[in-house]
Amino acid sequence: MPDAFCRDWTSEMGANYSMSKKRHEELKKIISEHDHNYHVLDKPTITDYEYDQLFAELLDIEKNPKGLDLSDSPSQRVGGTVLEGFTKAQHRLPMLSLANSYSPEDIFEFDERVRKFLNTEDPVEYLCELKFDGLSMELIYENGQLVRAITRGDGTVGEDVTHNIKTIKSIPLKLSHKNPPPLLEVRGEVLMFKEDFARLNETQQENGQQTFANPRNAAAGTVRQLDSRIAASRPLRFFGYALGAVEGETFNTQKNIQEYFNDHGIPTVLPYKEDLLVVAKGPEEVVKYYHHIEKVRPKLPFDIDGVVIKVNSLRLQEDLGLVARSPRWATAAKFKPEQAQTTVEDIVVQVGRTGALTPVAIMKPVKVGGVTVTNATLHNQDEITRKDIRIGDTVIIQRAGDVIPEVVEVVNPDKRPADRLPYSIPERCPACDSVAVKAEGEVVTRCVNPLCIAVVKESLKHFVARRAMNIDKVGDRLIETLVDNKLLTRFSDFYRLTKEQILSLERQGDKSADNIIKSIENSKNPTLARFIFALGIRFVGEQTGKHLADHFLTIDKFLEASEEELLQVPEIGAKVAKSIRDWTGNPKLVDEVKAMIELGVKIAGPVRAQEGSLSGMSFLITGTLPVKRDDAKDLIERNGGKILGSVSSKLNYLVVGDDPGSKVEKAQGLGVKIISWEELQAMI
């Protein structure tokens, strides 16, 4: 073949490749803009046919993907990834929960608290926005590229659902920003529009599949699918409203953040005409907004259950700080929940982990806010007596906070039959037949038998919970079965379970048994705070567990603490101190803790940063380690180290496991030291 021909042919191929690559970039941009116009602005500028032609051209070019950047291509939204399970992911900054209010009066009280804390009489400027009824989500952009999406989870650790979130067409895979920040965490809500939800349920019904109770359940269920093709087939939406961690950008107000999102392709409510987001000066304007949104709520294309009020100034937010897990500078003003009328068919009593007997009304099924309700809590005997609720009554029920069903009132109680007698909680525990006791000054009747089968089951369920020991493969049904088969009666029994014992149960296969044993094994390194919370001591919640861990530092010191010493712990009063001491003063319960330690449970106390062997050092993990990534992070933090979210000049060590990503190359370029899991352990 002549050299000249070869040169001409090669030159032509190179030119064609260059043109294809250029056209590919053009198509990505054009299609992404049309996606934004259609799915975010609801203002399509081309026909469906024209859009399909552009998409077909894109797919045709991508048949030969060599040299093409597919990471932000619209073709990546069609789904196809199928995961074996979800991986846990830690938020760089906690996703805090908000305090709730339910009336305009509460808004005035919130404003008064804010001004009092700031020591000012001047009106405070608030950003008022919608409280979406969806699934909270954090999108993480690195250098403008969407790299990860994490559910809220417990506020500290969520689940990585990137494979599904990338299928949502309103979410940009790449920010429309010429110089994107190195890191931008966008927080918002995944939801489903009412009209889309109705169509989805019609399709589900036509296909003989289970329908969803409401748009929120549909959105949450879709996001948690392991197969991203399912998510891609369902009409999910996203609205951004808050920041997580950010590098390379500064903001002065909450409104600035929303405007920034809107300007760079992240969906917000700003394009809507109904003034869904406003800046209000003083509580009067906030209340005006509250009533406005309450009025337009039925017309909105999506569900909301209230409004969120935030101090607009980020500097003032910093001054106000936090209270436990909630910011002082924000509150959620809920709307009155939807109600319905039904009949109380029976009243049954459930026994909780502290022995509390809780009456529950079994009702004729009725839909409230799109959800079929069949039972509602009656709280306690005083509540039943106050409302005079009897079996057979017609009642008004509502979903408190649009979630938990409760009985509001009895309809026409004066017209009920004479033989319909008042209801009284039984004097004996329905689970173990022990005498039930109502202590002086309390409204709750309790079973005081520590061996009550119901108390044991509920205590064990609490022990394995996500925020406690986090034994995620052991669910409520399995605990019921294990207890009924006398394989589980106390906490330490979890660590005595064998694969053979699990296989002896119905519907338990080899893989399932392996997963259960592995899950139990993985729970053996809890923090002291989690372990204390898991014990289920009355009045000791998650936050109190953290205070106790920070104060006593070791499990031994906690178990030995006197009431006087317990009273020195922040936010612990006489009642809580006595409850803790009653528990730690019981030799059988203390022996149970010792038994768990002997069975391999290693309880890690909090380490002061200056005391840790890794103090002052920053770490990032990439690839698969011999242990769970969250456990590795806990190990680093317990020894004073700090976890960073991305490779930067601030990073000291990149811990590399199997199949590492592109972070290794970036770290090498910045001169960051790269170490193995074994080298990290040696440093500790």
Curated annotation (Swiss-Prot):
SUPFAM superfamilies noted in UniProt: BRCT domain, DNA ligase/mRNA capping enzyme, catalytic domain, Nucleic acid-binding proteins, RuvA domain 2-like
EC number: 6.5.1.2
Binding residue positions for NAD(+): 48-52, 97-98, 129, 152, 189, 310, 334
Cofactor section: Mg(2+); Mn(2+)
Active site (UniProt): 131 (n6-amp-lysine intermediate)
Molecular function in Gene Ontology: DNA binding; DNA ligase (NAD+) activity; metal ion binding
Protein name per its UniProtKB record: DNA ligase
The species this protein was found in: Bdellovibrio bacteriovorus (strain ATCC 15356 / DSM 50701 / NCIMB 9529 / HD100)
Source species taxonomy: Bacteria, Pseudomonadati, Bdellovibrionota, Bdellovibrionia, Bdellovibrionales
